[in-house]
């Protein structure tokens, strides 16, 4: 059991027979009445996001997710194949199970495959990944005065906002949790 006071971003809980990960949480202490914790929870199986409020100190069952280190090998239509790096066992996940992670997933990348109660739940990417810019507009001299940004298409097809000084062919470090540019590689 985990107390609602101990919720952190990334905490996993069991609710209504499903596993959820805490995306956002906020402790609220109103002037009148008891404190409570407002959360945004993501269903690990379906990917849907729900908002839920818990009383401060309320006990909730902790979802025990098993994380296995695997390597992404290839895709075949809507099937994505991963290999366990320890015993070389291969598993296949459907596109709808890993839809959000596809933006930053590239071949031979090491990831964690999540299982809960023996069921494959999804993929957890590293916090940052190194990706190549395949298309972006050239930065025009003097554009940086406002510190703006421009869209860039990465090798995985994801489009992220990058500073004006980034050019095609450069390797970037991208935060997979937010989809934001971090730095040049």
From Swiss-Prot:
One of its GO terms (molecular function) is translation elongation factor activity. Pathway: Protein biosynthesis; polypeptide chain elongation. It is found in: Cytoplasm. GO terms for biological process: peptide biosynthetic process. The keyword DNA damage does not apply. The keyword Nucleotide-binding does not apply. Keywords: Cytoplasm, Elongation factor, Protein biosynthesis. NCBIfam families: efp (TIGR00038), PRK00529.1 (NF001810). Belongs to the elongation factor P family. InterPro entries: Elong-fact-P_C, NA-bd_OB-fold, Rib_uL2_dom2, Transl_elong_fac_P/YeiP, Transl_elong_KOW-like, Transl_elong_P/YeiP_cen, Transl_elong_P/YeiP_CS, Transl_elongation_fac_P. One of its GO terms (cellular component) is cytoplasm. Involved in peptide bond synthesis. Stimulates efficient translation and peptide-bond synthesis on native or reconstituted 70S ribosomes in vitro. Probably functions indirectly by altering the affinity of the ribosome for aminoacyl-tRNA, thus increasing their reactivity as acceptors for peptidyl transferase. Signal peptide: none annotated. This is Elongation factor P.
